[in-house]
């Protein structure tokens, strides 16, 4: 296997932790990723961050409720799963995204 990682960073206009966790967990599974672990943290008074450890790398969410948006980032060594995931995310509430990077 060649050492390559595909990465995408996206801002979305949703910041509800329950909605985000449910929809992105589904997108990851439907894309073929193997979820090895999941961690989340709720900030006081508001805010949320979550991290999925994947067999193929990782996915993270960071909410910014005061600005009504969230930042998501996916990194993957499996370009097929990565592209499936991005196709699912395109149906979601994207504000701004960076170009896909292969590292």
Segments from the language model and where they lie:
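Polybasic/polar functional segments that serve as interface/processing modules
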Residues: 1-103
């Amino acid at each position: 296997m060649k050492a390559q990682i595909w990465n995408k960073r996206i801002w979305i206009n949703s910041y509800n932790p329950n909605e985000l966790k449910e929809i992105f967990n589904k997108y990851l599974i439907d894309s073929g990723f193997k979820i090895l672990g999941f961690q989340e943290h709720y900030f006081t008074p508001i805010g949320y961050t979550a991290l999925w450890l994947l067999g193929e790398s990782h996915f993270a969410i960071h909410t910014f409720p005061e600005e009504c948006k969230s930042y998501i980032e996916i990194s993957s060594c499996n370009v097929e799963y990565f592209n499936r995931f991005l196709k699912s995310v395109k149906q979601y509430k994207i504000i701004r995204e960076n170009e896909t990077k292969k590292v």
